[in-house]
């Protein structure tokens, strides 16, 4: 009896540790200064796809409140999914009165233009912090003719409906998992997968928020574990049934906000 109780206690502790999440909520960051431009056309069709791998931003739930980040902010793709609050600042000629703020999600990369000076065309050159906004959201804070405006910005918690979405692409020997709709910090810095016949295996970032594994996972129920930049972890146990197919999307547990 004592041995059975010990085994049950050990099992409970292991599952509790695996499912533990760092307490609290993501609190965001302090206000900082940057600049903003716009791209993608009046319907934001030119913002689809992008360096984060989200594809159609409408169907993924990001809409037009999105931005491409300069090198200094993009962080080699690690900032994909992060949310920011922006205000047009210190430019009364072009900023809308009342300095309304907007909330945007990082979905793309604004590449540097080293042939141009950073204050005249090379807006996204390092070390410059710059947001290239989808045109519809830019027009909420400034006039079209401005072209470029100074902004104040800060990281804020991402508020998303539903759970974290995991879309599994690839083939038998190459699994590419796109992670979207992440609440809290919004970005993902570490991801793992567990098959029903395997232990936990780390996924490596392929590009943007696409994470890869070369393990053979076909025919197994899958669990996913992800960690945001705030070090909170969410584990979704057996969320993918064993008969899953490539191209399908599955919903796991999201972070508290």
UniProtKB/Swiss-Prot annotation:
InterPro entries: Expan_Lol_pI, Expansin, Expansin/allergen_DPBB_dom, Expansin_CBD, Expansin_CBD_sf, RlpA-like_DPBB, RlpA-like_sf. It is found in: Secreted, Cell wall; Membrane. GO terms for biological process: plant-type cell wall loosening; syncytium formation. It is a peripheral membrane protein. Residues 1-20 form the signal peptide. Keywords: Cell wall, Cell wall biogenesis/degradation, Disulfide bond, Membrane, Secreted, Signal. The keyword Disulfide bond applies. GO terms for cellular component: extracellular region; membrane; plant-type cell wall; plasmodesma. Expressed in the vascular bundles throughout the plant. The keyword Cell wall biogenesis/degradation applies. Residues 49-163 form the Expansin-like EG45 domain. PROSITE patterns: EXPANSIN_CBD (PS50843), EXPANSIN_EG45 (PS50842). Disulfide bonds join 52-80, 83-158, 88-95. It comes from the Eukaryota. Residues 173-252 form the Expansin-like CBD domain. Its main location: secreted. Causes loosening and extension of plant cell walls by disrupting non-covalent bonding between cellulose microfibrils and matrix glucans. No enzymatic activity has been found. Belongs to the expansin family. Expansin A subfamily. This is Expansin-A4. The lineage of its organism: Eukaryota, Viridiplantae, Streptophyta, Embryophyta, Tracheophyta.
């Amino acid at each position: 009896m004592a041995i059975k109780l010990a085994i049950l206690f050990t099992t409970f502790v292991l599952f509790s540790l695996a499912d533990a999440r760092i307490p609290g909520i993501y609190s965001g960051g302090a206000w900082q200064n940057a600049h903003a431009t716009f791209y993608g056309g009046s319907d934001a069709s030119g913002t689809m796809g992008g360096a984060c791998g989200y594809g159609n931003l409408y169907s993924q739930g990001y809409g037009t409140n999105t931005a491409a980040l300069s090198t200094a902010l993009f962080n080699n793709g690690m900032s994909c999914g992060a949310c920011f609050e922006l205000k047009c600042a210190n430019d009364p000629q072009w900023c809308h009165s009342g300095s309304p703020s907007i909330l945007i999600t990082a979905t793309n990369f604004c590449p540097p233009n080293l042939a141009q000076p950073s204050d005249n065309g090379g807006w996204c050159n390092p070390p410059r912090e710059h947001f290239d906004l989808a045109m519809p959201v830019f027009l909420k804070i400034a006039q079209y003719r401005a072209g470029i405006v100074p902004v104040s910005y800060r990281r804020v918690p991402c508020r998303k409906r539903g759970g974290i979405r995991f879309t599994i692409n690839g083939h038998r020997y190459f699994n590419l998992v796109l992670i979207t709709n992440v609440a809290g910090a919004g970005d993902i810095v570490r991801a793992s997968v567990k098959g029903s016949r395997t232990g936990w295996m780390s996924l490596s970032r392929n590009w943007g928020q696409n994470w890869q594994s070369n393990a053979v996972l076909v025919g197994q129920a899958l669990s996913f574990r992800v960690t945001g930049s705030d070090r909170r972890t969410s584990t979704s146990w057996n969320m993918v049934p064993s008969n899953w197919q490539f191209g399908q999307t599955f919903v796991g547990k999201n972070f508290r906000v």
